């Protein structure tokens, strides 16, 4: 007990916490050392004394050194790096600066978690990581009350006690993977932790005293924005898009290859992968926004080279140079067809663009028109919003049927089947609206859609094209898939400033406001133009339809 009193005197606790601990020590004095209650009280006092109340790391104020660390550890990711340098710059001028709460949102394998470690080194903070994937119990965050047998503080307090300072960098990994059940909602418990206005009085259920978390720098990582809104509101979101081919090649040469050579006991004089081979490796053996799959493929090559050396008579590896034709020998047949989207023009088939948890992707949209009774089939695991997009696209086509030279009453005697492969993958969202509409027009007019054109945009019943999200990821996917032309909503023109100039040079990006502007670009022939050539033979109703189209700013000629 004397030892506990000495530790308490040097702990630097606030008055209220010190008073609480003193009363517990007094209680312990009056108990039998062998009683179960004494063990509980002793455990509580130990936790109170283990938590860092005053001890801090000295935060680095050397901005240039921090910048060098961030640049050397990660390629690209300029938004995050700028935000950290801004924080360090402000810190030099302000005595008490609350730690920022950043949330890095991006696909797997882009370096979110490893970036957290780099930021800790750049700011000279100790690094603590807490995986939130699968956490369902509120007590994991806030701790259990002392009335429970075997109760402990929450993971936040436990990790701080383990690291020994009150201002570490705390990485909350996979914050979007938290669940909830009858034991409470951990996302709601995190509201207090991540709110800079409240977290200086964080109350753990076990400690029962206020603890100041305002010195902690919290960084959260997530694969999607599927995070409860109140929690999202408390964090500063920094989106990390996928890497471009050139960036992947640089990362592989500078970081991944040297790392795998070291892990597999090889030297640079034993294995070299040419730039062209690295590009083919990225194109034909991986399809991802990050570089995790690329690292696995490089590791596979390294293992094969080591095996070859182990089976050789002299047990040493001579220099192995990997050229493009060698990849099949080391990695097997090609897994992906690079440039597959550049296939021939097909009737009723359009390339759309989507955003998934692993970045942007190409989406094939198929529509078949067959004689029947006017039924509509939708297959391909479509979500509610996408099913509504199909209905909206159908109405747009019906309202323009005469102007598009589509058979009168087609909705009563033609069955339309909308299918979006791959069938087992769930799909949702409104951004495939113009793709579905174009595929329907192509199927009903028998005019092929251009295979080298991809499109994204939400459609209204009047045929107006509305803005979508994730434009950068979608354009990166189009670039990866060798698409030549991408049609986007006019409202997304402002987002083009964030797109790398290399992508914009190699892609023709065309903004549109109405579905009618799309037909000249996406179809091999424009049904409006075909109809205009025989305008004199139109009946009054069709003439009126054509005027509607012209009034929306699209000339039929």
Residues covered by each model-derived region:
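Conserved catalytic/switch belt of AAA+ P-loop NTPases
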Residues: 172-211
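Walker A/P-loop
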Residues: 100-132, 161, 191
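AAA+/SF3 P-loop NTPase mechanochemical coupling elements
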Residues: 163-167, 202-221, 271-273, 414
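Conserved alpha-helical scaffold flanking the Walker A/P-loop in AAA+ ATPase domains
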Residues: 147-171, 203-210, 475
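AAA+/P-loop NTPase substrate/partner-engagement loops
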Residues: 122-151, 159, 179, 247
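Peripheral, non-AAA+ core regions of ATP-driven protein-machinery
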Residues: 319, 340, 346-351, 359-557
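Extended, charged alpha-helical coiled-coil/arm scaffolds that mediate oligomerization and mechanical coupling
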Residues: 1-95
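Conserved C-terminal "switch" segment of AAA+ ATPases
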Residues: 11-18, 54-59, 164, 224-237, ...
């Amino acid at each position: 007990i004397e030892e506990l009193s000495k530790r308490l005197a040097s702990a630097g606790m606030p008055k209220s916490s010190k008073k609480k601990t003193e009363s517990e020590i007094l209680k312990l004095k009056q108990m039998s050392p062998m009683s179960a209650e004494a063990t509980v009280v002793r455990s509580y006092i130990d936790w109170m004394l283990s938590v860092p109340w005053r001890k801090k790391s000295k935060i680095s104020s050397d901005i240039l050194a921090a910048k060098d660390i961030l640049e050397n550890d990660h390629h690209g990711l300029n938004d995050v790096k700028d935000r950290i340098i801004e924080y360090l710059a402000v810190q030099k001028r302000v005595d008490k600066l609350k730690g920022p709460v950043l949330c890095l949102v991006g696909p797997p394998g882009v370096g979110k978690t490893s970036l957290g470690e780099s930021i800790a080194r750049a700011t000279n903070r100790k690094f603590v990581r807490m995986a939130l994937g699968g956490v369902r119990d509120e007590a994991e965050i806030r701790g259990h009350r002392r009335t429970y047998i075997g109760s402990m503080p929450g993971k936040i307090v436990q990790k701080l006690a383990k690291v020994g300072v009150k201002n570490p960098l705390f990485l909350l990994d996979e914050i979007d993977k938290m669940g909830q059940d009858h034991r409470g909602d951990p996302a709601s418990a995190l509201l207090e932790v991540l709110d800079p206005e409240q977290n200086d009085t964080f109350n753990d259920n076990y400690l029962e005293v206020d603890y100041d978390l305002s010195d902690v720098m919290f960084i959260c990582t997530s694969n999607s924005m599927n995070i409860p809104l109140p929690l999202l509101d408390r964090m500063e979101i920094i989106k990390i898009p996928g890497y471009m081919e050139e960036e992947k090649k640089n990362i592989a040469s500078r970081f991944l290859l040297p790392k795998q050579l070291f892990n597999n006991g090889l030297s640079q004089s034993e294995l070299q992968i040419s730039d062209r081979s690295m590009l083919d490796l990225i194109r034909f053996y991986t399809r991802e926004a990050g570089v995790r799959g690329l690292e696995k493929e490089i590791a596979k090559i390294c293992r094969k080279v080591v095996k070859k050396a182990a089976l050789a008579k002299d047990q040493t590896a001579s220099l192995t140079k990997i050229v493009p034709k060698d990849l099949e020998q080391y990695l097997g047949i090609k897994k992906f067809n690079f440039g597959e989207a550049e296939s021939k023009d097909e009737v009723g088939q359009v390339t759309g663009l989507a955003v998934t948890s692993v970045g942007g992707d190409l989406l094939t949209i198929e529509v078949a028109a067959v004689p029947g009774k006017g039924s509509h089939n939708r297959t391909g695991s479509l979500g509610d919003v996408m099913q509504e997009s199909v209905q909206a696209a159908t109405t747009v086509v019906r309202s323009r049927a005469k102007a598009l030279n589509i058979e009168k009453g087609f909705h009563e005697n033609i069955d339309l089947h909308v299918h979006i492969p791959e069938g087992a993958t769930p799909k949702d969202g409104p951004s495939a609206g113009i793709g579905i509409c174009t595929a329907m027009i192509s199927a009903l007019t028998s005019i092929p859609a251009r295979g080298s054109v991809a499109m994204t945009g939400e459609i209204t019943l009047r045929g107006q094209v509305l803005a979508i999200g994730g434009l950068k990821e979608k354009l990166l996917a189009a670039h990866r898939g060798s698409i030549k032309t991408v049609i986007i909503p006019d409202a997304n023109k402002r987002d083009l400033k964030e797109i790398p100039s290399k992508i914009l040079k190699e892609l023709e990006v065309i903004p549109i406001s109405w579905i009618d502007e799309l037909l000249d670009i996406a179809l091999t022939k424009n049904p409006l133009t075909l109809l205009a050539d025989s305008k004199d033979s139109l009946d009054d109703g069709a003439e009126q339809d054509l005027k509607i189209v012209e009034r929306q700013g699209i000339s039929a000629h």
